[in-house]
Amino acid sequence: MSAEVALVYRVLPDSVEVNIDKLKTDIINKLSPKYKVDKVEVEEIGFGIKALRFYIRMPESEEYSSDEVEELLRSVEGVGGYELEYFSRLSF
């Protein structure tokens, strides 16, 4: 069995007016089906601003990359910024 890579991204909307649920759905739709989104958390930052934390899994392969994930995140309307918080190789 091949190894997988786990990624955790924190995504910020570009304004407080962004519907966080729609942003979450748009990002999941953009990443799927190529990348597996295991979990999404909503984080209250303050002043009405919320961030999304995406737990993503992908095969360890040249066909998959964190660079591509970031390109996909940038292409979603409403994404103001993102940060890769965690990156780890998983093998079972």
From Swiss-Prot:
Keywords: Elongation factor, Protein biosynthesis. The keyword Protein biosynthesis applies. The keyword Protein biosynthesis applies. GO terms for molecular function: translation elongation factor activity. CDD domains: EF1B (cd00292). It holds the Pfam family EF1_GNE. InterPro entries: eEF-1beta-like_sf, EF1B_bsu/dsu_GNE, Transl_elong_EF1B/ribsomal_bS6, Transl_elong_EF1B_B_arc. HAMAP family: EF1_beta. Promotes the exchange of GDP for GTP in EF-1-alpha/GDP, thus allowing the regeneration of EF-1-alpha/GTP that could then be used to form the ternary complex EF-1-alpha/GTP/AAtRNA. Belongs to the EF-1-beta/EF-1-delta family. This is Elongation factor 1-beta.
